[in-house]
A protein has these predicted regions:
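A structured beta-alpha segment of the ubiquitous adenosine-cofactor-binding alpha/beta core
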Residues: 439-441, 507-527
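Positively charged, amphipathic and often flexible ligand-engagement surfaces
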Residues: 9-283
Length: 594
C-alpha cells in the first residue's frame, strides 16, 4: 500500500518566495508522516504538483531523502508530470539523487492534471514560453521518453506508470522487455475495462508486474476539486478514455502512434496557443516571469540590488537649479533613505503650463501613428529597465516583489494599449454619412494641456496610464505624481523622454498637491484633469474647474479606493484567507480596482 499526500492541501503557502519557511515548517511535518508510513510498511509518495512549485518540491524531496529517520527505506517516492517540459531533467536529477543516497526512489509517472491551469498562468504571467507541451501528442511522446529514462535509471528508480491509455500500456510493455521490476497504476473508477482486458491478455500479475489502484481519501471539500479535474480530464476531446467511448471515433486514430502523430504536425507546437508574449491579437503582452523560477528570479533580484546602489534623484521640470531637496524614505523602514526629490513650486507649475500650452499643437499635429510609435518604444524601455523600476516600487512604494513586477507590466500594457488607440482613432479622419454633394468627416484631436494626478498605491502603473492616454490623444501633459512616490514616477518620465516624447510636451511636477493644484486649476489654458485618489479631492478639483472662466475642462476621476469584501457560503475558506491577506497587505486594502 502507498500514501500519496498533497502538500498544498496542508499549506497554501507552498511557494518559492517562502522557501525558508517551507523548509522549516513543512519538511519536518512530512518527515514525521513519512516515518510513520515507514513504520507501517507503507509507501509515501509526494507530488511535484504545478510547474511553479517544481523547484520547491524538489528541494523538499531532497531534504526528505537526506533525513536520518528515512534512511534504509525505498518507500519514499515522487510523482512526476510528463506534460512538463522539465520532466526528463527531473528524472535525471532523481536518478542521481537515488544513487547518492543509496536508495531506490519510486517514481510515479503521470501525464499531468493541471494543463489548463499551467497554460492560463503562463499567459497571465507573460512568461517566455509555456512550461508544458501544447499538444497532447507532445505529452504522449514525453511520457514515452520519460519511461525509457526511468528504465535506464537502474537501481536508483522504481518505475510506476500511471495511465489509462492502451497505446501507452503497450509501449511500456515493449520498453520493459523481460523486466518485471515496475508497476502500472490506475485511478479508482477509471480504466477498469482496459485493465481487465490487459490482465486477461497479457497476464502481468503472473509475471510479477503489479497494478496499483489509486483511491482519493478526504472530506467532500478536499475531494471536490480533485473530482472536477478528473471529469475535465476525461471529458476532453483528446482524452483516450473519452474517445474510446465515442462509437464514431476511428480505432486507428485512437491508438495512433504519438511519435508519428507529432512528427506529422507542422508546427510541432499548437498554433492556436500563441506564446504568452504574442497572445493578444493587436498588441504585445507585457513581459513577465515567475518568481518561483530561480533562473529568472535570481538575476532580477541581483539587478534590482545593483540599481539602487546609489541614491536616486528626482527633479521637477524647470527646477534643475533649485536648492531645496527633500528626502524620500523607505516606508517599510523610515531610517532608510531611498533618494531625494527637488519639488516643483507654484511658479514652476505656471512656467510648465505655459511651455506645454505652446507645444501642444505640434504634438497633436504629429498624428496618431507617430505618437503610437513613441509610446510603443517607451513600453520597450520600461521592460528594458524593469529591474530598476521594480526596485523603486519595492523601496519607495513598499510593494512586494510580485506586485512590483505587476506594476511594471501594467504600465507597459497601458503604453501599448494607448498606442493602439492612437493609431485607430487619431490617425485618419472618419467618413460620415450625409446628403448627396456633401463630404462629412470627423477627426479626433487633443484638447490642449492635461494635468495628470496619480496616487501612491499604483505609482507607476496608474501614473503611466494617465500620461499615456493623454499623450496618445494629442495632449501635452503636466504629470503630478503622489507626494510619497516621486522617484519611480521620475524614472517613468525619463524613459518617456528617451522614447521620443519632447520635454516641453511632458513636464514632471512633483510636490505639494494643493499648492500645485491651485496654480493650475484656475488657469483657462488647462484643458483637462485626469485624477485618481479620494472622492473628496476629486470634488474639490471639479469645483475649481467649474468656477473658472473659459472653456469647460474635462475631468476624468477614479475615486474611492477603500473596498469591502463580501464572502458568501459557497466560497472556499482557503481562497478567502488568501484574498483577505492579499487585500490587507497590498496597498493596505485601499485599491480603486478589484
Amino acid at each position: 500500500r502507498n500514501l500519496h499526500p498533497f502538500p498544498t492541501r496542508r499549506s497554501s503557502d507552498l511557494e518559492y518566495a517562502k522557501h525558508e519557511r517551507v523548509m522549516r515548517e513543512l519538511v519536518p511535518t512530512l518527515i514525521s508522516l513519512a516515518a510513520e508510513a515507514k513504520a507501517a510498511y507503507l509507501g509515501f509518495t509526494i507530488d511535484a504538483e504545478e510547474a511553479e512549485r517544481l523547484d520547491l518540491m524538489l528541494d523538499v524531496f531532497e531534504a526528505l531523502s537526506a533525513a536520518p529517520e528515512l534512511q534504509n527505506w525505498n518507500g519514499l517516492g515522487l510523482a512526476v508530470q510528463a506534460y512538463q517540459k522539465r520532466a526528463l531533467p527531473t528524472l535525471g536529477w532523481l536518478t542521481e539523487l537515488g544513487r547518492a543516497h543509496k536508495r531506490r526512489i519510486p517514481v510515479r509517472l503521470v501525464k499531468g492534471a493541471y494543463w489548463d491551469t499551467e497554460i492560463k498562468r503562463a499567459q497571465e504571467g507573460g512568461v517566455t514560453d509555456y512550461p508544458v507541451f501544447t499538444r497532447k501528442a507532445g505529452t504522449d511522446v514525453s511520457y514515452i521518453a520519460c519511461a525509457r529514462a526511468m528504465f535506464a535509471g537502474g537501481d536508483a528508480i522504481y518505475p510506476q506508470f500511471a495511465t489509462h491509455n492502451a497505446h501507452t500500456l503497450a509501449v511500456i510493455e515493449t520498453l520493459a522487455a523481460s523486466r518485471t521490476d515496475f508497476e502500472f497504476q490506475r485511478l479508482h473508477g477509471m480504466g477498469e475495462a482496459l485493465y481487465d482486458v490487459f490482465h486477461d491478455l497479457r497476464k502481468p500479475a503472473a509475471r510479477g508486474i503489479g497494478t496499483r489502484v489509486y483511491a482519493p481519501v478526504g472530506s467532500h471539500e478536499d475531494l471536490l476539486a480533485y473530482l472536477v479535474r478528473r471529469l475535465l480530464e476525461n471529458g476532453a476531446n483528446t482524452s483516450f478514455v473519452n474517445r474510446l467511448a465515442d462509437e464514431e471515433a476511428p480505432i486507428d486514430d485512437i491508438v495512433a502512434d504519438p511519435v508519428a502523430t507529432l512528427s506529422s504536425l507542422t508546427p510541432r507546437r499548437n498554433p492556436r496557443l500563441l506564446l504568452p508574449h504574442d497572445m493578444l491579437p493587436d498588441r504585445k503582452n507585457s513581459q513577465g516571469f515567475f518568481w518561483s523560477d530561480p533562473a529568472a528570479a535570481a538575476p532580477a533580484l541581483a539587478e534590482m540590488k545593483r540599481s539602487l546602489a546609489s541614491s536616486q534623484l528626482a527633479i521637477a521640470s524647470g527646477a534643475e537649479n533649485a536648492r531645496g531637496v527633500k528626502s524620500v524614505l523607505d516606508p517599510s523602514d523610515r531610517r532608510r533613505k531611498v533618494g531625494e526629490v527637488v519639488e516643483a513650486t507654484p511658479e514652476h507649475a505656471k512656467v510648465a503650463l505655459q511651455s506645454a500650452h505652446r507645444a501642444a499643437h505640434d504634438w497633436d499635429a504629429l498624428g496618431g501613428d507617430a505618437r503610437a510609435t513613441i509610446l510603443e518604444r517607451a513600453a520597450d524601455l520600461y521592460e528594458r529597465d524593469r529591474a530598476h523600476l521594480m526596485a523603486l516600487a519595492v523601496r519607495e512604494a513598499g510593494k512586494t516583489l510580485p506586485t512590483a513586477l505587476g506594476e511594471v507590466r501594467e504600465a507597459a500594457d497601458f503604453l501599448r494599449y494607448y498606442a493602439k488607440r492612437a493609431r485607430a482613432e487619431f490617425q485618419n479622419a472618419e467618413q460620415l454619412p450625409g446628403p448627396t454633394g456633401e463630404d462629412n468627416k470627423i477627426s479626433l484631436h487633443g484638447r490642449g494641456v492635461f494635468a495628470c494626478i496619480a496616487p501612491w498605491n499604483f505609482p507607476l502603473a496608474i501614473f503611466t496610464g494617465q500620461v499615456a492616454g493623454a499623450l496618445a490623444a494629442g495632449n501635452a501633459v503636466l504629470a503630478k505624481p503622489a507626494e510619497q512616490t516621486p522617484l519611480i514616477a521620475a524614472a517613468g518620465v525619463k524613459l518617456l523622454h528617451e522614447a521620443g516624447v519632447p520635454e516641453d510636451v511632458l513636464h514632471f511636477l512633483p510636490g505639494d498637491g494643493p499648492a500645485i493644484g491651485n496654480a493650475l486649476l484656475s488657469d483657462a489654458r488647462l484643458a483637462g484633469v485626469a485624477f485618481t485618489g479620494s472622492t473628496e479631492a476629486a470634488n474639490a478639483i471639479n469645483r475649481a474647474l467649474a468656477a473658472r472662466d473659459g472653456p469647460i475642462a474635462a475631468l476624468i476621476a477614479e475615486t474611492g479606493g477603500q473596498n469591502a469584501m463580501i464572502v458568501d457560503s459557497t466560497a472556499l475558506p482557503e481562497q478567502v484567507a488568501r484574498d483577505v491577506l492579499a487585500s490587507a497587505f497590498d496597498s493596505a486594502g485601499q485599491r480603486c480596482s478589484a
